[in-house]
Design a protein with these regions (language model features):
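The AdoMet/dcAdoMet-binding core of the Class I SAM-like
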Residues: 9, 45-46, 51-168
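Rossmann-like AdoMet
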Residues: 1-64, 83
Length: 172
């Protein structure tokens, strides 16, 4: 199916969709803007530049024990952290169950003792932590852009409270 036909079909349904072009998979949210990209031959490689930039947190926290992420998308960042940081416990909040449902297509790991996806609002999710997170990664978008609940002063205060003493937060 052509990308245009897929977009028009999904736009009517209002759901995220996956487009395959050869060995590349991309995630879209009812428009032609790529939200995530994965090469099937190298599924753990961070294909988009912004994801490599966000991993700059390793300069400040080279061995994080606890990482909380808001926004799953195609799972590039959580998957990379899971594979490359074997001593890290990773929790991901994704508000959209239709995005979570695509996890197998993007080869995102199953939940286990050190990796878990929570289908909930990231702003509510982050309230569960207190001075415990070494890294908070915020990459939460909806069809219109940044999710409104992730743009409030209260959200940023909750993130600050959730960080460990040496913790860092990165925001796309």
């Amino acid at each position: 199916m052509s990308l245009l036909k897929t977009i028009l079909n999904r736009r009517q349904k209002g759901k995220p969709f996956v487009h395959r072009d050869g060995r590349e998979l991309s995630l879209h949210f009812s428009e032609p803007v790529v939200q995530s990209n994965m090469n099937l031959d190298q599924p753990d490689v961070l294909a988009l530049g912004y994801t490599r930039t966000m991993m700059g947190f390793l300069l400040f926290v080279p061995e994080p024990k606890k990482i909380s992420m808001i926004g799953l998308g195609g799972g590039s960042l959580p998957k990379y952290c899971y594979r490359q940081l074997p001593d890290s416990k990773i929790s991901v909040a994704e508000i959209n169950p239709d995005v979570v449902a695509l996890r197998n297509e993007f080869l995102i790991p199953e939940d286990d003792g050190r990796f878990r996806i929570h289908c909930e609002d990231g702003a509510r999710f982050i309230k569960n932590f207190c001075a415990s997170e070494d890294v908070i990664v915020v990459d939460g978008y909806d069809i219109a852009g940044h999710a409104p609940s992730l743009c409030t002063e209260k959200f940023y205060a909750d993130c600050y409270r959730a960080l460990s003493r040496q913790g860092v937060m990165v925001v796309n």
